[in-house]
Amino acid sequence: FEVAALCGCGIPTGYGSSTRSGDVRPGEDVAIVGVGGVGTAALQGAVIAGARNIFAIDPVEWKREQALKFGATHAFASVEEAAMSIAEITHGHMCHKVIVTVGEVHGKDVDTWMGITAKAGTCVLTGMGNMMESDVTLNLAMLTLLQKNLQGSIFGGANPKLDIPNLLSMYKLGKLNIADMITRQYRLDQINEGYQDMLDGKNIRGVIRYTDEDH
């Protein structure tokens, strides 16, 4: 049940951000910005889609270590730190796809993410922004001249009736590692601890387990 619980939202959102909204193709270079639960699912989506280099970017060292275990080829603490290495590894082309799965998106960061997006590449915004914020900073000349794309994504562009059964089938076949994304399980009376661990970056995914005593 704990594996199925993750497939209600986080797994299809992340996986679909790479495979549907991002349409990652074999041989492409991909950056995943934020490798928590949704980002790790996006990372696995990029791996399964056949990405060549996968750059995991997250300020939490433990999450970067986990990302390498899930298939990332490189890991960095920030986009600024990653940019020079991405340019060197891709011979200046940068990333065909940039999947942004941070907890909260801010307009001031969009141009930074677009900066590691390749010519004619796509930056997918899966992380949510503030509904009251309308201050995206973007170099429009570079957007036009380099034909870059900025793509919003909800639920990874997934079809729940089709994709959730498919994801569970991939898990059963050993192609999608969902179980190892569950860092810790909590009782209902530990729910506040679970939220705090999430905010502190201690979990890839935490699961609240209900028992008969909770009814």
For the regions a protein language model found, what residue spans apply to each?
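A local structural motif
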Residues: A51-R52, M94, K175-D180
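Structural detector of well-ordered beta-strand residues that form the stable sheet scaffold
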Residues: A31, F55, T122-V124, Q151, ...
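Conserved beta-strand scaffold positions in the cores of enzyme catalytic domains, especially
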Residues: A75, L150-G152, M181, Q185
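Glycine-rich cofactor phosphate-binding loops and adjacent beta1-alpha1 units
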Residues: G22-R25, R64-N149, D214-H215
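Residues in the short beta-alpha loop(s) of Rossmann-like NAD(P)-binding domains
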Residues: V60, G129, G156
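Mid-domain Rossmann-like dinucleotide-binding core that forms the NAD(H)/NADP(H) cofactor-binding site
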Residues: F1-M84
